[in-house]
C-alpha cells in the first residue's frame, strides 16, 4: 500500500497545524483527533484535509 500525506486542520480556526502519513487503502472516513492548536491556545478537534 502506498502512503500519502494528509494535513490536520483545526476545526475552530481552520489553521493546518499538523501533517500525518496515511495509507491509501480502504478508508471510509476522514481522521479526527483532539490535538493542541497553538493559535487557539487550547485542545481542539483536528480533521484530516488533503
Curated annotation (Swiss-Prot):
Entry GO terms, CC: cytoplasm; ribonucleoprotein complex; ribosome
Superkingdom of origin organism: Bacteria
Signal sequence bounds: none
Keyword annotations of the record: Ribonucleoprotein, Ribosomal protein
GO biological process, one term: translation
Key word Lyase present: no
Keyword Transmembrane annotated: no
Record-linked InterPro entries: Ribosomal_bL33, Ribosomal_bL33_sf, Ribosomal_zn-bd
SUPFAM superfamilies (alphabetical): Zn-binding ribosomal proteins
Family statement drawn from the similarity comment of this UniProt entry: Belongs to the bacterial ribosomal protein bL33 family.
This protein's name: Large ribosomal subunit protein bL33B
Organism: Enterococcus faecalis (strain ATCC 700802 / V583)
Lineage of the organism: Bacteria, Bacillati, Bacillota, Bacilli, Lactobacillales
Encoding gene (name): rpmG2
Amino acid at each position: 500500500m502506498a502512503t500519502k500525506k494528509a494535513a490536520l486542520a483545526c476545526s475552530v480556526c481552520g489553521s493546518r497545524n499538523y501533517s500525518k502519513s496515511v495509507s491509501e487503502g480502504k478508508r471510509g472516513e476522514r481522521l479526527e483527533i483532539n490535538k493542541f492548536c497553538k493559535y487557539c491556545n487550547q485542545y481542539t478537534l483536528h480533521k484530516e484535509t488533503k
